[in-house]
Regions:
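Contiguous, often N-terminal, cationic amphipathic patches that form binding interfaces
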Residues: 2, 8, 42, 46, ...
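Membrane-proximal N-terminal amphipathic helix
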Residues: 24-54, 59-64, 69
């Protein structure tokens, strides 16, 4: 009986850790899948329509431009529901930043975003930054030719509904899809928008999760791309 009791205590102690580890691996897999989906759609849309500055993006924050761009990409994705600029796709739930503060912004009701839901439940919203694809967001040719951005919820309305945990972002560049927080990005860098969960909003976490395959920024605040990509 004593042995069984010890086993039960050990199981109770280790089970939460195992569940958390499984959920983290699931998050990594889902986010990498979204990255692949967007990247493949970009390549196929580029082949059919040319680079994004030729997709009739019209102007900054243009509802028509966002719909023109996302509808072209949607041709090459497994879409369950396409909302365009109308509400009904991007779940209007209470999101929070990585630091726990409330995210007071409704994408679902914002017509400058075009929205869709993939067959696997992923929600994607897109808006236009520069119709000529020349917005500067970093120190590379790709990041100096930004056309628009994507906001992604990898599990729809399910919790935690938090930036950096199930809500992430990507960039549409003239030259491809870039995850927010990429090493050369300056607008939403990992160092200033993800590294410290107590103060940062979490918009710079996407690239870290994809390339380092962890959410260790939830457990320590001294990570960096070159010398420490895991807490332990």
């Amino acid at each position: 009986m004593i042995t069984l009791g010890i086993i039960g205590v050990v199981a109770a102690m280790t089970m939460p850790s195992l569940i958390a580890n499984h959920k983290e691996k699931e998050t990594v897999a889902k986010l990498k899948k979204v990255y692949s989906t967007l990247s493949n759609a970009y390549l196929l849309a580029k082949e059919k329509y040319g680079t994004p500055e030729n997709w009739e993006l019209t102007e900054y924050d243009s509802p028509e431009g966002a719909d023109n761009a996302l509808s072209k990409l949607a041709e090459f994705m497994n879409v369950a529901k396409y909302c365009g600029n109308a509400p009904g796709c991007y779940t209007d739930v209470d999101y929070r930043y990585l630091n726990g503060q409330k995210y007071n912004y409704s994408i679902d009701n914002n017509t400058s975003y075009a929205k869709l839901i993939l067959a696997d439940g992923t929600i994607i919203a897109m808006n236009i930054r520069e119709p000529d694809c020349k917005q500067d967001r970093g120190d590379s040719v790709v990041l100096k030719n930004v056309c628009g951005t994507f906001s992604v919820d990898i599990n729809g309305p399910k919790p935690p509904n938090q930036v950096g945990r199930d809500r992430y972002g990507f960039i549409l560049s003239k030259y491809g899809i870039i995850p927010h927080g990429a090493q050369l990005e300056t607008m939403f860098s990992f160092e200033t928008n993800c590294k410290d969960k107590s103060t940062h909003q979490g918009f710079g976490c996407t690239a870290w999760v994809i390339f380092n395959e962890n959410l260790d920024y939830m457990r320590c605040n001294d990570l960096d791309w070159e010398n420490k990509t895991k807490c332990k």
